Structures are given as structure tokens and as C-alpha cells.
Amino acid sequence: DNLNNRVELRDYQIDAFQNFITYYNSEGLHKNKQIHTLLHMATGSGKTLIMAGLILYLYKSGYRNFLFFVNMTNIVEKTKENFMNRLSSKYLFAETIEIDGDIVDIREVDNFQNTNENDINICFSTTQKLHFDLSVPQENSLTIEDFEDKKIVLISDESHHVNTLTKKGKDDIAEEQSWEYSVNRVFTANRDNIMLEFTATCDLKDP
């Protein structure tokens, strides 16, 4: 109901939502582990729409803080347009978002330290910037404490890039210096953190 009214869900998008909701609500499926999903969707199939729908669903489930990160800055900017710019033809949310009788605003934040618990708070970053912010803490940037103190939904687009360093087997790169280490560190900082990974190019033989 809170997606843009010009958006018409395709059958496979409805299936994706239903599959996630089933997984989210079934402890037997995620076996008492943190929720971590990978959605394999082709380019142009509406990945960002699924992200928007899951943000709304998880807000209703008690989540307020969302980190979107990707390998390339231009994708960050395109996603901001989809999520934040109400004047854009590609804006994905309804003009007014109402959840459980309350009007909900979407806000872009730099960190999660002083977020409004009534809003959808989204921090946009690149994988490189996330790694740098955690390695070299600075004022107003993300810190590991953000992920320890509040439950965060991590949304990773083209997540296979996160694993690049590890999969190439570059032994000379210390694990502590890799992007993958930083992502796993923030994901596991709080047991309630959720990881939603999206990719168009998953190697199903070696996922």
C-alpha cells in the first residue's frame, strides 16, 4: 500500500516478497540464525522495488534503520533518487507513507546515533567508504557502535563484489583489511541485524 501507486508488481516480485516473509517468520527455516538472504535478480527486473517493499515490511516489523551499500558511487546516487526524491519519476514510495495509522517520513542519515525512531532512516554508502569509516572512525560517520546499539538492516546491491578479495585468494591481504571483514563485522555486531543481498550475476555453481 505504501509503494508508489504507479508501480505494478510482477508475479515474480510478489513471489520474492512472499518468500521473504515466509522465511522471516519461520524460525525453522533460518534455524535460529541471523536473517541473511540473497536475492538473485536480473538487471532491469526491479531489484530496487523489492528493496523498497522490504524496507516497508521490516519497518512494520520493528526496524527503523537501514544501511544501503554498493560497490559503485553512481549506483548509490541512482538509489537515492529512487528512495528519497519525491519529484523523481522513479520514486518508489507513496507520496504519503502511513503505517499502523502513523505518517512515516524517510530520512537520509550519515549514521545511526541520533535517528528518529518514528522514521525510516537510510544511510547510503559505498563498500569502500563503509570499510574506511569503520577502520578510521570520524565524527558523524558510521562506527561499529551504531551496529551494536541498534538493530540495522544491511542492504547490499551486487554483493558479489563484497567477496571479491576473499574469492581471489589474495593471501597478502590481511582479513582485517578486507571489505568482506568489515561487512561481516557490522552484520554480526548485533544478533538482530539483518543482511539483504541483491545480485544480478550470482554464480550459482559457487554462490
Locate the predicted segments by residue.
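N-terminal pre-P-loop "Q-motif" helix
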Residues: 6-33
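Short helix/loop segment immediately N-terminal to the Walker
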Residues: 26-39, 136, 141-143
